[in-house]
């Protein structure tokens, strides 16, 4: 009898060990599928964070790729975080992206950054000159005024300098302050500043929130100075912000740069392919969650020419019938 009991116990132990052995690989396979990427965006009051969060959540909910959106400190800082390996994806203005890759302008002192490539260009972000003073009608009217021009060394800062320069003005012609979008909006509301440069996709959360409590005005760039500005930089394009976006008295003419998602070169081709394809195969669904989704297009996504595309992104675009030149692969 004792032998029978011992035999039964031995068999139970064998079955238990087999069950444990069989379950381990299944768990391992499951965890291996869920790759994790961190996506640095922008401040909470800007479009980068709002839209980036939508994209990250959509990809995470519909694929085996986990993407987490975090707040960021602007294009230059996002490039630096990518280069340091602290994040794998990051929003960046197209002009700042080129400065980083070439080691010019904002990156002249630190040198070229070669650790990133393009995942997709998503939409145009406008240089918005915001004021609550109806007497400020042109850029020239900013002379002698207190103006927020973004953090020193940021993309916004250089955009502001470019616009002022088109009018023959410099930073010395204004009283500059260096604030984020959200802080600029608060300062405008409290009448601590006269105007602010905000470079983000319209409608921008900070400006929308401001417009709910008071009348806001956007300063237009006239045709003559628009031509000067466009001739000075290949990264700008003319753009009109319709009056109904913020409830301004009239449409406003300004310039725009592209909002681009950059990715570290060492992220796998499969992960980048999944990220890009999930976004552009589901534009309608994403548009229901954020207005910028309606601006997504494959043609614009694959239109960058100054920085190479990640192989995973290039593969997807070419499968859709688009051509990525060899020098951009």
Report the location of each language-model feature.
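Short, low-complexity disordered leader/linker segments with a strong preference
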Residues: 1-37
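Extracytoplasmic
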Residues: 34, 64, 74-77, 84, ...
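Short helices/loops that flank or line small-molecule/ion binding pockets
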Residues: 53, 76-88, 162, 182-194, ...
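Acidic, polar ligand-binding/catalytic clefts
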Residues: 87-123, 204
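Pocket-lining segment of extracytoplasmic ligand-binding domains
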Residues: 94-96, 103-107, 171-262, 266-267
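Ligand-binding clefts/hinges and TM-proximal coupling segments of bilobed small-molecule sensing domains
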Residues: 146-162, 234-306
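An extracytoplasmic/periplasmic, membrane-proximal ligand-sensing/linker region
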Residues: 183, 190, 200-213, 218, ...
């Amino acid at each position: 009898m004792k032998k029978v009991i011992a035999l039964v116990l031995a068999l139970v132990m064998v079955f238990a060990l087999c069950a444990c052995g069989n379950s381990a690989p299944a768990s391992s396979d499951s965890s291996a599928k869920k790759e994790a990427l961190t996506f640095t965006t922008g401040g909470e009051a800007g479009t980068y964070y709002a839209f980036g969060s939508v994209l990250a959540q959509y990809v995470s909910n519909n694929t085996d790729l986990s993407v987490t959106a975090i707040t960021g400190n602007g294009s230059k800082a996002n490039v630096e975080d990518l280069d340091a390996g602290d994040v794998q994806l990051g929003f960046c203005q197209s002009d700042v992206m080129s400065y980083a890759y070439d080691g010019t302008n904002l990156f002249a002192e630190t040198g070229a950054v070669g650790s990133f490539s393009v995942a997709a260009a998503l939409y145009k972000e406008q240089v918005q000159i915001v004021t609550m003073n109806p007497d400020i009608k042109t850029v020239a009217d900013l002379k002698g005024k207190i103006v927020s021009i973004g953090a020193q060394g940021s993309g916004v800062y250089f955009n502001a300098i470019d616009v002022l320069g088109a009018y023959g003005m410099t930073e010395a012609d204004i009283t500059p302050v260096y604030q984020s979008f959200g802080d600029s909006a608060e300062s405008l509301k409290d009448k601590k500043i006269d105007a602010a440069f905000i470079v983000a996709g319209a409608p921008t959360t900070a400006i929308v929130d401001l417009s709910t409590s008071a009348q806001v005005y956007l300063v237009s760039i006239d045709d003559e100075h628009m031509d000067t500005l466009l001739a000075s930089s290949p990264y700008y394009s003319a753009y009109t912000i319709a009056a109904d976006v913020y409830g301004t008295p009239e449409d406003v003419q300004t310039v725009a740069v592209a909002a681009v998602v950059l990715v570290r070169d060492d992220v796998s081709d499969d992960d980048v392919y999944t990220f890009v394809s999930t976004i552009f195969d589901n534009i309608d669904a994403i548009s229901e969650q954020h207005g910028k989704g309606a601006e997504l297009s494959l043609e614009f996504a694959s239109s960058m020419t100054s920085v190479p595309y990640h192989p995973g992104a290039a593969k997807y675009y070419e499968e859709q019938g688009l051509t990525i030149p060899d020098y951009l692969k």
